[in-house]
C-alpha cells in the first residue's frame, strides 16, 4: 500500500498456501511407513555354569538387539547344551 489512504490498485493479494492439516485439523499420512528390518546377529558369550564358549545367532530389529544386549548384561545368562541338560527346569528334574 502506498499513500495515506488505501485504494483498490494499492492492495496486493497473494494466495496463502497452508498445509491441509492446519485448516481442517486433518493429519497427513506418511507416504511409506518405514518398518524396521530383521537382521541376523551373531552373539558370542560364555556358559554361565562352566565358562565354555557359546555362539547364538538371532534375527532382530535394531531395537530388539539392543534390548537383548541389556538383558545379557544385567538379567539373563546363557548355558551351553551340556550344562542345560543337567539343570532342573522350572524346579523339575
From Swiss-Prot:
Zn finger (unnamed) start-end: 47-83
Tell me one GO biological process term: DNA-templated transcription
This entry's Gene Ontology molecular function terms read:
DNA binding; DNA-binding transcription factor activity; protein domain specific binding; zinc ion binding
The record's Pfam families line, in alphabetical order, gives: E7 (PF00527)
Protein modification: Highly phosphorylated.
Keyword Transmembrane helix set for record:
no
For the region E7 terminal domain, give the residue spans. 1-39
Q: Where in the cell is it found?
A: Host cytoplasm; Host nucleus
Assigned keywords, A-Z: Activator, DNA-binding, Early protein, G1/S host cell cycle checkpoint dysregulation by virus, Host cytoplasm, Host nucleus, Host-virus interaction, Inhibition of host innate immune response by virus, Inhibition of host interferon signaling pathway by virus, Interferon antiviral system evasion, Metal-binding, Modulation of host cell cycle by virus, Oncogene, Transcription, Transcription regulation, Viral immunoevasion, Zinc, Zinc-finger
Example of a GO cellular component annotation carried by this entry = host cell nucleus
Query: Please, which domain of life does this record's source organism belong to?
Result: Viruses
Q: Which stretch carries the motif Nuclear export signal?
A: 65-73
Cited InterPro entries = Papilloma_E7 (IPR000148)
- Grouped into one coarse class, the protein's main location is host cell
What task does this protein carry out? Plays a role in viral genome replication by driving entry of quiescent cells into the cell cycle. Stimulation of progression from G1 to S phase allows the virus to efficiently use the cellular DNA replicating machinery to achieve viral genome replication. E7 protein has both transforming and trans-activating activities. Induces the disassembly of the E2F1 transcription factor from RB1, with subsequent transcriptional activation of E2F1-regulated S-phase genes. Interferes with host histone deacetylation mediated by HDAC1 and HDAC2, leading to transcription activation.
Q: Which family does it belong to?
A: Belongs to the papillomaviridae E7 protein family.
Q: What is known of its domains?
A: The E7 terminal domain is an intrinsically disordered domain, whose flexibility and conformational transitions confer target adaptability to the oncoprotein. It allows adaptation to a variety of protein targets and exposes the PEST degradation sequence that regulates its turnover in the cell.
* Subunit composition and interactions: Homodimer. Homooligomer. Interacts with host RB1; this interaction induces dissociation of RB1-E2F1 complex thereby disrupting RB1 activity. Interacts with host EP300; this interaction represses EP300 transcriptional activity. Interacts with protein E2; this interaction inhibits E7 oncogenic activity. Interacts with host TMEM173/STING; this interaction impairs the ability of TMEM173/STING to sense cytosolic DNA and promote the production of type I interferon (IFN-alpha and IFN-beta).
Name recorded for this polypeptide: Protein E7
Give the species this sequence originates from.
Human papillomavirus type 48
Amino acid at each position: 500500500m502506498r499513500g495515506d489512504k488505501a485504494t483498490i490498485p494499492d492492495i496486493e493479494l497473494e494466495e496463502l498456501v497452508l498445509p491441509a492439516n492446519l485448516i481442517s485439523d486433518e493429519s497427513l499420512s506418511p507416504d511409506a511407513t518405514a518398518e524396521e528390518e530383521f537382521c541376523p546377529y551373531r552373539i558370542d558369550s560364555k556358559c554361565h555354569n562352566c565358562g565354555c564358549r557359546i555362539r547364538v545367532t538371532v534375527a532382530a530389529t535394531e531395537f530388539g538387539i539392543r534390548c537383548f544386549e541389556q538383558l545379557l548384561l544385567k538379567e539373563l545368562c546363557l548355558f551351553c547344551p551340556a550344562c542345560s541338560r543337567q539343570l532342573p527346569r522350572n524346579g523339575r528334574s
